[in-house]
Amino acid sequence: MLRKAGLACTICGSRNYTLNLSSVAKEKRVEVKKFCRTCGKHTLHKETR
């Protein structure tokens, strides 16, 4: 089963993206470098629950 998780910018905190992840419990949260529209540059985005 899939669960929905959001990705938030580590600099400004805005939630820009959503992901469908497997429901298997993971120890670490997903970290991806994506473009932030608020900051106007590529920044690290971390999974929010």
Swiss-Prot record:
Name this polypeptide is given: Large ribosomal subunit protein bL33B
Similarity section: Belongs to the bacterial ribosomal protein bL33 family.
Alphabetical list of InterPro entries matching this protein: Ribosomal_bL33 (IPR001705), Ribosomal_bL33_sf (IPR038584), Ribosomal_zn-bd (IPR011332)
Key words, A-Z: Ribonucleoprotein, Ribosomal protein
GO cellular component, one term: ribonucleoprotein complex
Biological-process GO terms, alphabetical: translation
The organism's taxonomic lineage, starting at the top: Bacteria, Bacillati, Bacillota, Bacilli, Lactobacillales
Gene giving rise to this polypeptide: rpmG2
One function term, GO molecular function aspect: structural constituent of ribosome
HAMAP family linked to this entry: Ribosomal_bL33
SUPFAM superfamilies: Zn-binding ribosomal proteins
